[in-house]
Amino acid sequence: MENGLVAPADVAGMKVRIGAEANVEEAAAIARAMATHAETDVEVYVGDDDEPAATGEADLSPVEDDLGPTDRERDLLAQIEAIEAGGPEKYKEQLPEEGKRFVRDRLELWFGADGLTFEDGRFAEFDADDELAADGLLTGAAEFEGRDVHVMANDYTVKRGSMAGKGVEKFLRMQQRALKTGSPVLYLMDSSGGRIDQQTGFFANREGIGKYYYNHSRLSGRVPQICVLYGPCIAGAAYTPVFADFTIMVEGMSAMAIASPRMVEMVTGEDIDLDALGGPEVHTTESGSADLVARDEEHARELVAQLVRYLPDNSDERPPRTATTPPTRSPEGIDAVVPQDPNEGYDMQDVIERVVDRHSFFELQPEYGPEILTGFAHLDGRPVGVIANQPAHRAGAIFPDAAEKAAQFAWTCDAYNVPLLYLCDTPGFMAGSQVEKDAILEKGKKMIYATSEATVPKQCVVVRKAYGAGIYAMSGPAYDPESTIALPSGEIGIMGPEAAINAVYARKLAEIDDADERAEREQELREEYREDIDVRRMASEVVIDEVVPPSTLRDQLVDRFAFYEDVEKDRPSKKHGTVL
């Protein structure tokens, strides 16, 4: 347009065309003036030129004046600074000796220099005679690995992170808001429990500490709850870690127990230190209450960052997909990894690394019930939960602790819409007097129940042995998997050949006097039985869906999970099951 007429502004700003006689200085002056007046970027074109002769950028910074900050605001900022300094300096000075960060420094590690996006309840207990910074408990929201999360963090410099009235109120509000937003919750725990001298008003009240665990229960399966322990969590404080979906302890600093060593000695006479009572080794190898142990605070954050890659924000969403990568090891080697001898051990991790995306297997509870592997992985970028028998431990037989571990993992995956991959190579549930005392039937029931109830897509692979009720627990044909496929090394039967022949033919074999003849007949019977349980026979009877070449297993699983991605399964109409 000629003579200073203006073209309509668009999202990129305003374009102005002036007469051809104007020079660059005039164009620049016009651009600056119009950008200031219109509060938008301006391009000025001279004559018929295609390129602007000058541009003006709008200055949208606030107009400076002399109205602030006031003394009132400066006083408030000073008060906030004092609160954020935490408890007494002497307690802060002790933290490095224990390998710990001050809680607000910890938040910077997790969320960057600005820490929390916003904080709630910072002034809790500000007016108390004995001022307690934020009542020793920080709550708010933050962005973590690109996601909005609710956050709770104890301040150990304030009464050793203990809990009392105002802090309890903050904790409860944070949980209740998580139910509304559907965002994950991070609990950064470092608490010695409830303040015994202040228990009136927060212990047994309707809105007291007991409500924590009510809210934990309501949040369970709704949004991921992740807990990291940075210190001793005793009594009531120890329940948050076990209610969380995932719990990480930090080596050398964290512990959890229903009572302190002093209380244990008073009640039972047992003299025990905190680490032996409830340290990381106890809870990752014996109780199963913790999933992982971090080397230090930085490692704890890294582990949680890895973990959330496999999880959705809530139960209404699917877990996020990532770009696919080839497996760490070649699928061509799968058949060579699985021994010809069905009784020879091998590492199932080697099979997993040849099936899932490169370096994507994230194992949980590796030291607890190690005869079953549980963990997340990506398969063609799709998150899956892996439940795999581990022949390198206890021949892959399922013991009570492993059954409980697998049940909990399957239940969690189903809650958060993570498909399940079962890799079966087990002689079945372990037998004997000790496992009966350890509740093998009860805990085996839980594993079978969790597998039965899962409505996410499931794929079962018979890698080698699938004996007894092991094939039930590992989502065999009767448990509504989308597919049951087998490798040529697979066998499906009530029991293995050795046990079966001994059970059925022991008396007849004993009647053969010649030892060589008896051994020969026993071997013949074993071979006949082995043919009966061979997966080709099972495929012939359409017990399983397919026998696949091992080198194609990854491709088979990628295609099957993709095809059944949107499968819908209904549970019978009922309030809930009775298995817990």
Briefly describe each language-model feature range:
Residues 2-6, 11, 21-22, 29-42, ...:
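Polar/charged, Gly/Pro-rich intrinsically disordered segments
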Residues 19-24, 396-398:
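Short, glycine-rich nucleotide/cofactor-binding loops
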Residues 27-30, 443-444:
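Well-ordered, non-membrane alpha-helical segments in soluble/globular domains
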Residues 39, 51-580:
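Ligand-binding clefts of soluble mixed alpha/beta catalytic domains
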